[in-house]
């Protein structure tokens, strides 16, 4: 049986992190978690990490698409925080953000990790941005590192 799986060390990987400024008090913690994980576990150097800041979560897919189209990156991490309010706005923003980022991954055959918090309350968002429930930015970075390696390994195996 042939099993393809990746590890998380990616010293030479070039990673873009597309970050929403909206709810920045939460998103900055996600960014810190992602960068820390890329450096400590992935051994990714500072010069191989590019941060792109956009106004809100709805702008993440377009920025991610532009990054992917450049061909200069091995993967993209999208970070943001969308918190449910009293209107259906949450559903539109969260849904379109998720769908758009998935489309970028498929269109460009590039790992795009979803580190966008979609929570019902601000307390849930705080818990997921570095307190009780861990740091979802760091988790998104781990998933991305593994997918970068899985796709490289798969490419190599398919050529053999």
From Swiss-Prot:
EC number annotated for this UniProt entry: 2.5.1.78
GO MF: 6,7-dimethyl-8-ribityllumazine synthase activity
Disulfide bonds: none
Active site (UniProt): 89
Binding, (2S)-2-hydroxy-3-oxobutyl phosphate: 86-87, 128
Catalytic activity reported: (2S)-2-hydroxy-3-oxobutyl phosphate + 5-amino-6-(D-ribitylamino)uracil = 6,7-dimethyl-8-(1-D-ribityl)lumazine + phosphate + 2 H2O + H(+)
Gene3D superfamilies associated with the record: Lumazine/riboflavin synthase
GO terms for biological process, alphabetical: riboflavin biosynthetic process
Binding residues for 5-amino-6-(D-ribitylamino)uracil: 22, 57-59, 81-83, 114
Top class in the EC scheme: transferase
Keywords: Riboflavin biosynthesis, Transferase
Function as written in the Swiss-Prot or TrEMBL entry: Catalyzes the formation of 6,7-dimethyl-8-ribityllumazine by condensation of 5-amino-6-(D-ribitylamino)uracil with 3,4-dihydroxy-2-butanone 4-phosphate. This is the penultimate step in the biosynthesis of riboflavin.
Membership in a protein family: Belongs to the DMRL synthase family.
Summary of subunit composition and partner proteins: Forms an icosahedral capsid composed of 60 subunits, arranged as a dodecamer of pentamers.
Name of the protein this chain belongs to: 6,7-dimethyl-8-ribityllumazine synthase
Organism: Shewanella sediminis (strain HAW-EB3)
Source taxonomy: Bacteria, Pseudomonadati, Pseudomonadota, Gammaproteobacteria, Alteromonadales
């Amino acid at each position: 049986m042939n099993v393809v799986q990746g590890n998380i060390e990616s010293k030479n990987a070039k990673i873009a992190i597309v970050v929403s400024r909206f709810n920045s008090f939460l998103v900055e913690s996600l960014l810190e978690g992602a960068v820390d994980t890329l450096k400590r576990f992935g051994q990714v150097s500072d010069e191989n990490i590019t941060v792109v800041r956009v106004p809100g979560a709805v702008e993440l897919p377009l920025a991610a698409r532009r990054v992917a189209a450049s061909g200069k990156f091995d993967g993209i991490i999208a970070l943001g925080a969308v918190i449910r309010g009293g209107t259906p706005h949450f559903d539109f923003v969260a849904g379109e953000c998720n769908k758009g980022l998935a489309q970028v991954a498929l269109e460009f055959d590039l790992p795009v990790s979803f580190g966008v918090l979609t929570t019902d309350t601000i307390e849930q968002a705080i818990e997921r941005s570095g307190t009780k429930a861990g740091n979802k930015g760091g988790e998104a970075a781990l998933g991305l590192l593994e997918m970068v390696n899985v796709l490289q390994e798969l490419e190599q195996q398919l050529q053999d």
